[in-house]
């Protein structure tokens, strides 16, 4: 099975991939061998200018791995280095080599991120054809992200594999503490992912990977470099950019490696602000934004030279704080809303290998604060809403190899707590703003087995879930994936998976401001089947798939449009069925890359015509994306992104009229002058100045111009 190295490929759909390690020299350290476990090892350096095709194969029935790249045809083309295999992703509990696993994973690499015309992590996901990104404000002020026709509550957001979902509301899920420059890659797993990422991954999961690079070149998993990292070098990265609507963003990143202990530390900080692109009826700013982030991460090997146990530990801690004009986010009748959030993230992750047995324990704690003002700065007229959430979790994933394949098992405990002015049950001892609250715990067990043959892989398992809030017994959600490799270019895959999601605290208790919640909502459940085919050679990659989702008890906010005094109510939809098709094509020709993708969805639900949906039934019927990346000359590169979206559903205007969502197209472009130590760029978003909405009554900005520069200093 050949694996093709795709340079600057925006949102490559990939199957689980095994990290290829490249050794420039041997360190004779025990943890260097540990880094090789489950990965392909290559020795030496291969230049793109001389490498046409290379392949590495095993002599047993476990894996066949290779690589192909296009040679540089021009003398002035940048001289780049390529390894045989660039990305390791996880679509199963047990790590599997590329070409073995059946789950489809979409990967956005470091190079793709640098080429994108975006100001936030949220904007990066718009290019993934199966992902729906609905914005209520610019530069990541508030963004709802979902997959394959779901809602923002139905996906799991992970930071380095740690679940950071907010049990209060999915609206705050993307308050990430890391800057774009911290990211190594973004992984998108489409479809139910319960047995891989646990509960809340009803329609999929998104994993933001910021793991620090090992500048010594000895750590395999961390061998992928973030933007400022240079192998063997401590360094500092600076970024400064500005643009339309008073936009300004500054960031810095420091990477340090302590040679005696191999302790790696990365710390980053960023600040972003904007005046916004419109004003309220009273002439006040109502789409302004300001926010800052601080993020620290580190790792260190713990094994000694003589130890037979190989281990390492990594950790991260981060802070995200932002305030933004909420425009007409939650009510068209009030156009001076405001919201401020603060998020704290901490996690410690371990990895231990004892012979064939591997352990990956994790412990994490996240805290969030949220203050919402219906009338900005006027608490006397309408009291502010205050919320504080705490999430504590313990997770253990283990696996071992034996004659029948690879088996994974483990467990997770997650406790979710909220203190609020209006969410939850009355507290016995109120304090500060908080008079209401709720606490619930989720316990899950998982088991998975993988049968690995030369051309066939079968992965089957289940997750068993029990939540203290709900009266349902311990419930099992199974899944099975299969893939068949036909020759060196074709792959067939099929899967059946199931998952569930507990209601958020907002869905259970938010009964203010024209909303009425139901605290007796049932958990959502989904079962899905999927099948597809993938073809790839040195120039072309094609992938086509079809999927069917059968959902029970989907949660939504609905309103009876016949009643002028009606309020939004949280309800369970009995059944919702979704049929979808996806197609991806990528072409590489010398200095150019062209990527086209299309997704079509159709949902069937016996719903009364007078009921208006706020989330579940407002899905993208059609989404088309196109990316063109061209190396113009010398160090100058051009990236052009196009997106067409056609959304189902309706919304009620401030005048009481019911309107359907209209399809729209957006065109973005970026020119980048890239040298070894610096880059200068200019980009334009919404070049045609098109007026559109992702949510009713919340207009999005028109043409937005941004220019910036980055500079990397080796210490």
Where are the language model's segments positioned?
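Face-selective signature of the C-terminal outer-membrane beta-barrel domain
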Residues: 299-321, 340-475, 479, 483-485, ...
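C-terminal beta-signal and adjacent terminal beta-strands/loops
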Residues: 550-552, 644-651, 669-715
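Short acidic/polar hinge/loop motifs at secondary-structure boundaries
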Residues: 163-192
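Periplasmic-side early beta-strands and strand-to-turn transitions of outer-membrane beta-barrels
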Residues: 194-195, 215-225, 241, 252-341
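Extracytoplasmic beta-strand/coil segments of soluble accessory domains associated
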Residues: 90, 122, 126-162, 166, ...
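Gram-negative outer-membrane beta-barrel transporters
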Residues: 452-458, 548-550, 571-653, 688, ...
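Short, acidic, small-residue-rich periplasmic hinge/interaction motif at the N-terminus
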Residues: 59-114, 122, 152, 353
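Outer-membrane beta-barrel signature, preferentially recognizing the C-terminal barrel domain
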Residues: 229-231, 332-354, 387-389, 471, ...
């Amino acid at each position: 099975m050949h694996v093709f190295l795709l340079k600057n490929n925006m949102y490559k759909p990939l199957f689980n991939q095994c990290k290829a390690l490249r050794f420039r020299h041997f360190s004779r350290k025990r943890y260097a061998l540990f880094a090789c476990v489950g990965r392909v090892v290559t020795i030496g350096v291969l230049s793109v200018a001389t490498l046409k095709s290379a392949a590495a194969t095993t002599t047993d029935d476990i894996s066949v791995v290779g690589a192909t790249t296009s040679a540089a045809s021009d003398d002035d083309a940048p001289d780049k280095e390529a390894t045989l295999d660039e990305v390791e992703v996880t679509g199963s509990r047990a790590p599997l080599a590329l070409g073995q696993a059946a789950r489809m994973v979409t990967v956005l690499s470091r190079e793709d991120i640098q080429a994108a015309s975006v100001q936030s992590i949220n904007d990066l996901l718009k290019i993934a054809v199966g992902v729906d990104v609905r914005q209520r404000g610019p530069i990541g002020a508030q963004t709802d992200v979902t997959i394959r026709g779901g809602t923002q509550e139905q996906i799991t957001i992970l930071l380095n594999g740690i679940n950071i979902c907010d049990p209060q509301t999915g609206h705050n899920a993307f308050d990430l503490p890391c800057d774009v420059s911290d990211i190594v890659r973004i992984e998108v797993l489409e479809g139910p992912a319960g047995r891989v990422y646990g509960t809340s991954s009803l329609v999929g999961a998104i994993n933001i990977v910021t793991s620090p690079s090992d500048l010594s070149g000895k750590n395999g998993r961390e061998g992928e470099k973030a933007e400022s990292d240079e192998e063997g070098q401590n360094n500092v990265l600076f970024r400064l950019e500005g643009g339309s609507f008073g936009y300004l963003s500054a960031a810095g990143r420091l990477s340090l490696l302590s040679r005696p202990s191999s302790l790696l530390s990365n710390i980053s900080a960023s600040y972003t602000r904007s005046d916004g692109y419109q004003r309220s009826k009273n002439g006040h700013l109502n789409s302004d934004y300001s926010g800052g982030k601080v993020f620290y991460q580190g790792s260190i090997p713990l094994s000694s030279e003589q130890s037979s146990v190989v281990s390492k530990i990594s950790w991260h801690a981060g802070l995200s704080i932002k305030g933004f004009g909420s425009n007409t986010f939650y009510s068209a009748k009030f156009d001076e809303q405001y919201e401020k959030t603060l998020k704290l993230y901490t996690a410690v992750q371990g990895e231990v290998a004892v012979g064939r047995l591997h352990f990956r324990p994790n412990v994490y704690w996240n805290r969030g604060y949220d203050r919402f003002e219906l009338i900005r700065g006027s608490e006397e007229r309408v009291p502010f809403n205050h919320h504080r959430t705490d999430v504590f979790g313990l997770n253990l994933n283990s696996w071992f190899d034996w004659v029948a394949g690879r088996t994974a098992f483990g467990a997770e405990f997650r406790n979710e707590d909220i203190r609020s002015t209006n969410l939850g049950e009355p507290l016995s001892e109120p304090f500060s703003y908080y008079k209401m609250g709720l606490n619930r715990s989720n316990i899950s067990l998982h088991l998975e087995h993988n049968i690995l043959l030369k051309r066939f892989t079968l992965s089957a398992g289940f997750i068993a879930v029990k939540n203290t809030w709900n009266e349902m017994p311990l419930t099992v959600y199974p899944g099975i994936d299969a893939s068949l490799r036909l020759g060196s270019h074709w792959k067939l895959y099929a899967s059946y998976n199931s998952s569930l999601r507990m209601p958020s605290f907002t869905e259970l208790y938010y009964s203010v401001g024209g909303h009425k919640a139901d605290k007796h909502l049932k958990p959502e459940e989904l079962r899905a089947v999927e099948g597809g085919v993938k073809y790839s050679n040195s120039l072309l990659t094609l992938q086509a798939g079809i999927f069917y989702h059968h959902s029970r008890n989907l949660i939504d906010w609905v309103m009876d449009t016949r009643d002028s005094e009606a309020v939004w109510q949280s309800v369970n939809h009995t059944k919702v069925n979704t049929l979808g098709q996806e197609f991806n094509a990528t072409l590489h020709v010398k200095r150019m890359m062209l990527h086209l993708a299309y997704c079509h969805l159709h949902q069937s639900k016996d719903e009364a015509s007078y009921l208006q949906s706020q989330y579940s039934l407002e899905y993208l019927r059609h989404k088309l994306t196109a990316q063109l990346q061209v190396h113009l000359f010398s160090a100058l590169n051009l990236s052009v992104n196009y997106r067409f979206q056609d959304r189902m559903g309706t919304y009620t205007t401030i005048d009481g009229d019911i309107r359907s969502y209209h399809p729209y197209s957006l065109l973005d472009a970026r020119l980048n002058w890239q040298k070894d130590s610096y880059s200068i760029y200019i980009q334009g978003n919404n070049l045609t100045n098109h007026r559109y909405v992702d949510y009713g009554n919340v207009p999005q900005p028109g043409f937005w111009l941004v220019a910036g520069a980055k500079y990397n200093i080796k210490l």
